[in-house]
């Protein structure tokens, strides 16, 4: 009887074949892999963004500390001929710095609270005639302060400030 119904096409078959189930499983697996990859990419972008934010906050903080100092030891020209800490005056740490050029050569290999970050500062005399780009051998009324904040997995952020005595 069943054979006769099959020949006549009267049996109503419902359900999925094994091939259809396998195709659906493969397609679902591929779509989940793409979705998980997108989530992972978003997570790494967020982590990189957080590191960049910390890096820029450290840069801004150090620049504010530099701007808070006087232009030079001398209150008027002629300015100091040597740039850097005056160890003879007892300037050995950041809290002892009293003018901008004390930061020349200042370096932190590991920033407190963010040990993966490091900082370097370079101070030079510059002149407007050179477009503030090349350092001058003598004293001028302008100092170029370059602050660089580095991280092992990111490129360094560097900012250059041109500071004058404001006379």
Descriptions of predicted regions:
Residues 1-16, 167:
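N-terminal leader/signal peptides at the extreme start of proteins
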Residues 4, 26, 35-38, 82, ...:
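Acidic/proline-rich low-complexity IDRs
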Residues 5-7, 11, 23, 53, ...:
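Intrinsically disordered, low-complexity segments enriched in glycine/proline and serine/threonine
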Residues 16-60:
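Aliphatic-rich helix starts adjacent to a transmembrane/signal segment
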Residues 50-167:
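Low-complexity, Gly/Pro-rich coil/beta segments used as flexible assembly/activation regions
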């Amino acid at each position: 009887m069943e054979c006769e119904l099959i020949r006549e096409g009267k049996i109503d078959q419902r359900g999925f074949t094994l091939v259809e189930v396998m195709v659906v499983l493969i397609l679902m697996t591929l779509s989940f892999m793409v979705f998980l990859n997108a989530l992972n990419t978003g997570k790494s972008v967020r982590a990189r963004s957080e590191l960049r934010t910390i890096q820029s906050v450290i840069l801004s903080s150090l620049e504010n500390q530099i701007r808070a100092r006087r232009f030079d030891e001398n209150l008027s020209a002629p300015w100091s001929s040597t740039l850097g800490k005056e160890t003879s005056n007892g300037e050995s740490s950041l809290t002892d710095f009293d003018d901008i050029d004390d930061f020349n050569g200042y370096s932190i290999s590991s920033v407190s609270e963010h040990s993966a970050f490091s900082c370097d500062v370079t101070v030079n005399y510059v002149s407007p005639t050179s477009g503030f780009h090349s350092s001058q051998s003598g004293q001028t009324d302008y100092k170029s302060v370059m602050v660089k904040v580095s991280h092992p997995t990111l490129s360094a952020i560097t900012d250059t400030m041109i500071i004058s005595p404001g006379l």
